[in-house]
UniProtKB/Swiss-Prot annotation:
GO terms for molecular function: DNA binding; zinc ion binding. It is found in: Host cytoplasm; Host nucleus. GO terms for cellular component: host cell cytoplasm; host cell nucleus. It comes from Human papillomavirus 21. This is Protein E6. The gene is E6. The lineage of its organism: Viruses, Monodnaviria, Shotokuvirae, Cossaviricota, Papovaviricetes.
Length: 168
């Protein structure tokens, strides 16, 4: 006769043992995974040039320039089953266009964004609707001063960065 304290293959672990295992795993916290490619390179102790990160959408590895742009745009790495993915320049532009076309909500002119949000322009997070770069204060003030548009897309504000405005 089998000992009642052992787990049978059919029944799995006992409720008491399962609770103990859950307790042990929940008390062990994994360190946070890096959010930027530079942080990933530092964690792996390799030069940024040696970081090969695939694009989540097309699967191509990002070039060194795209790696630098990814971090400059303040985008975050995507982790799936402890595998890391980023987004290449072409897929960033395609994703930005898709989001704008599918999830557009509203448009405001220049400084009206402050009235709508109740925040200072310096406290509003804005990304480029073309390349997804995080806009700096000068770029946001330029949009306000020229009375250009801010667009609300998928609950976040979009404008145009200094580089993309020259290609429109």
């Amino acid at each position: 006769m089998a000992d009642s304290s052992t787990d049978s293959a059919d029944e799995g672990p006992s409720p008491k043992r399962r609770h103990l295992e859950e307790e042990n795993t929940s008390s062990f916290l994994e360190p946070p995974l890096p959010a930027t490619i530079r942080d990933l390179a530092n964690l792996l102790e390799i030069p940024l040039d040696d970081c090969l990160v695939p694009c989540n959408f097309c699967g191509n590895f990002l070039t060194h320039l795209e790696v630098c742009e990814f971090d400059e745009k303040k985008l975050s790495l995507l982790w799936k089953d402890h595998c890391v993915f980023a987004c290449c320049r072409v897929c960033c532009a395609a994703t930005a266009t898709y989001e704008y076309n599918e999830f557009y909500e509203s448009t405001v002119v220049g400084r009206d964004i402050e009235e709508i949000t109740g925040k200072s322009i310096f406290d509003i997070d804005v990304r480029c609707y073309t390349c997804m770069k995080f806009l700096d204060s000068i770029e946001k003030l330029d949009i306000c001063g020229r009375k250009h548009f801010f667009h609300k897309v998928r609950g976040t504000w979009k404008g145009i960065c200094r580089l993309c405005k020259h290609f429109q």
